Amino acid sequence: MTDNAYPKLAGGAPDLPALELEVLDYWSRDDTFRASIARRDGAPEYVFYDGPPFANGLPHYGHLLTGYVKDIVPRYRTMRGYKVERRFGWDTHGLPAELEVERQLGITDKSQIEAMGIAAFNDACRASVLRYTDEWQAYVTRQARWVDFDNDYKTLDLAYMESVIWAFKQLWDKGLAYEGYRVLPYCWRDETPLSNHELRMDDDVYQSRQDPAVTVGFKVVGGQPDNGLDGAYLLVWTTTPWTLPSNLAVAVSPDITYVQVQAGDRRFVLAEARLAAYARELGEEPVVLGTYRGAELLGTRYLPPFAYFMDWPNAFQVLAGDFVTTDDGTGIVHMAPAYGEDDMVVAEAVGIAPVTPVDSKGRFDVTVADYQGQHVFDANAQIVRDLKTQSGPAAVNGPVLIRHETYEHPYPHCWRCRNPLIYRSVSSWFVRVTDFRDRMVELNQQITWYPEHVKDGQFGKWLQGARDWSISRNRYWGTPIPVWKSDDPAYPRIDVYGSLDELERDFGVRPANLHRPYIDELTRPNPDDPTGRSTMRRIPDVLDVWFDSGSMPYAQVHYPFENLDWFQGHYPGDFIVEYIGQTRGWFYTLHVLATALFDRPAFKTCVAHGIVLGFDGQKMSKSLRNYPDVTEVFDRDGSDAMRWFLMASPILRGGNLIVTEQGIRDGVRQVLLPLWNTYSFLALYAPKVGTWRVDSVHVLDRYILAKLAVLRDDLSESMEVYDIPGACEHLRQFTEALTNWYVRRSRSRFWAEDADAIDTLHTVLEVTTRLAAPLLPLITEIIWRGLTRERSVHLTDWPAPDLLPSDADLVAAMDQVRDVCSAASSLRKAKKLRVRLPLPKLIVAVENPQLLRPFVDLIGDELNVKQVELTDAIDTYGRFELTVNARVAGPRLGKDVQAAIKAVKAGDGVINPDGTLLAGPAVLTADEYNSRLVAADPESTAALPDGAGLVVLDGTVTAELEAEGWAKDRIRELQELRKSTGLDVSDRIRVVMSVPAEREDWARTHRDLIAGEILATDFEFADLADGVAIGDGVRVSIEKT
């Protein structure tokens, strides 16, 4: 292109993906990203924490969605004058990596890992977690997401891991880390416990599962002397028959009423409220032999269903449990303390220790010989058979199986390997979250959440019920728990280390690798053992991977060993974003560690977006192929199209989003193409590059500049509160006004090379591309560089508030003009009256018709009507229909809400000057009622948006109007013919037209109209044998003069 001309653009639809690749190549060669950071050296910093993804798989739509937000916000903040570092990170430890390696190597259990050697296995994990880094970098780059890959951090790095063990040592020193024996969610496939928050991260952790449910009678022995229960059966219900061999007690609620009933030759005890549920087994009206409060049953002894642990101290008695209800079951709960959290708490209180006959693989051990070696889920069937037949191990104590059914219920599954979990008592290390839970709730109030309801809803409620966090994992690839214990219980000692220096001090060697097995090789004599025979050895567990990622703010910079001042100035972070499930994951662990270590929140602002679903509304699945291939979308529609589709959706306000190819293409149609076509239109018709100007007096120029000023303010407001969908909607609406109103209404001015129009559109596009740059970084880069010839739109500042002239009255008036035209056009379309057919009259009824008075001619021209009449008599053509919003008003008004509804339905509602509604005995506020303007004659009348008024279209068609419409149809066809023959818009032509006899009068009447519109300096009628057929039997020939 020359210095005074816009680039020559290819005709037709743009190849947006190809243009995007050119931009990406330019950015790479120009090092534009680095320049954007360097340009802000010395500026205030905006701290963005980029949550680390796992790199042992390819990115999916969820990653892309979050990645776009992680790009938009830093771009915007950079344009607002901040320096925003964007350091990428990798989450490398934990089960995700281990399971991938197990799959690659054909490993099915931990014994095979031990056989191959921990060193070899962890080497394979290290290679696996970095396997897809190149692919990740390619995807992120194709997104047009700017991140610093060269200075990335990895949770497997020695410096990062040292900061993590420092954090653990800090918790230990504060008394917030301890070893305990608890019932935890346990994955028998991976042979490790999970923390409770991991069960609440994803909706699909709980999957529908069918399990056997049994109701079993346990025989009472030696009952209280006066309660008459000896020989009766306590009915218990359970969906885990495999736990019955470990039964040590049953629980009742002290406040529930229980009954002893006679059924056949047996007596059964259950909650009175559950009698009807067991009518089939106990009879419709069983004989009630006694009624008891639950408190009266406490201490009652019984025979367990299996006789494996008959001598267990304090076992086999009725205990009190506040968790017992009559919602289901029998009101009496079977307790196996090793496999139930509540069970263990209640049992421990009376001195009942748990029995643990299930090994780390979920199989019964030798203590229950009849089921030894069977997996607990597989053993269910045999256990039920033995109870039913009272054979085998169930024969001794004579339990009675009175019901066996299949029970379908949501059941927790491992979030990594997807196998059903069990609950199992294990020794684990914990963070004592319950000690500072209240402080976490307090600090949460300092965080700004989007959506706002997450603060006191999903996140806040989770914090209120937070339990101690199990942080140890019986695995291999992870940050080691830095705890060394004496191997001789006679000389107990625990040492906890928080740095490489401390390890070197005690072990005489500075670790070059903190991973297993090398860290396990560090041993030393126990200083507390005078015999010198015991050794300090590291416990074999590694830390929960969420402890790694929760340490990201300080571990990424090796705090506190380096960068102390930097960390203090960059903590807490200004902004983080992930999907809503991270309220139980990364958001949560960040908050736990920040509260415990620093007594501060880890982040100031958090966006928790919804979930991306496949086009069938289900979770995305590779096997179902229920989502468009990411690469194909990039290749066909481009990254900006995908970015717009995801960012403009409700998903960033907490809703879920179904991904469809049509939805992505709609973004191209609604915004990308209109922006490009406007730029292309300017480049085509402007004789030279426009000049920055905001002083045109033409009403359309003044309007679009003032409208742009509103866009600047609206986008600023939305982006400041992280409302990216709102920002997208503002941009979409402005693009609509720019292309379908300003440019279309100004075409003749551009064809005439009007300098005011050209300079105004140049100015508008220059500002618009800057405003849209964070949302659409690729297409705006192309347009902006074409307009300005400068380096990059992403090296510019956000437009200042005083950059553009404001005119709120003009914007309001012209927007109402557009609404009027839109409503009237819809009426015309409904009547099937073509656009070029003139109509006699349009009535516009609005509250302030004087506002529209200057635009009457514009409205008439736009709508092709001969007369536009303005009036304020809205009630002549429609009425306001009032309805009470009972959901909002009900809680305040109580019973008066029904009287208000009745009054409004009877037409007795009156809107007061202050906007309140008087309805019967009640006065309703503006949000407690709805007002809708309804047209009296819907066939000819339409309401304007927000009840601003009505338009009434007279669709009467006279012969004169039909003739003029016929002429305008021919004008359109002739303009298309000019275009197809390659004529420039300014070329004058000679026209010969052949018209059927029945249309000759119409043609001659409107000859001058036709000739003027198509720039015909010579126009004649004649018979043509070989002219071009256009419409309605007309043939023409044209030639340039």
From Swiss-Prot:
Monomer. Disulfide bonds: none annotated. This is Isoleucine--tRNA ligase. Its cofactor is Zn(2+). Gene3D superfamilies: HUPs, Isoleucyl-tRNA Synthetase, Domain 1, Valyl/Leucyl/Isoleucyl-tRNA synthetase, editing domain. ATP binds at residue 622. It comes from Mycobacterium bovis (strain ATCC BAA-935 / AF2122/97). InterPro entries: aa-tRNA-synth_I_CS, aa-tRNA-synth_Ia, Anticodon_Ile_ABEc, Ile-tRNA-ligase, Ile-tRNA-ligase_type2, M/V/L/I-tRNA-synth_anticd-bd, Rossmann-like_a/b/a_fold, tRNAsynth_Ia_anticodon-bd. GO terms for molecular function: aminoacyl-tRNA deacylase activity; ATP binding; isoleucine-tRNA ligase activity; tRNA binding; zinc ion binding. The lineage of its organism: Bacteria, Bacillati, Actinomycetota, Actinomycetes, Mycobacteriales. One of its GO terms (cellular component) is cytoplasm.
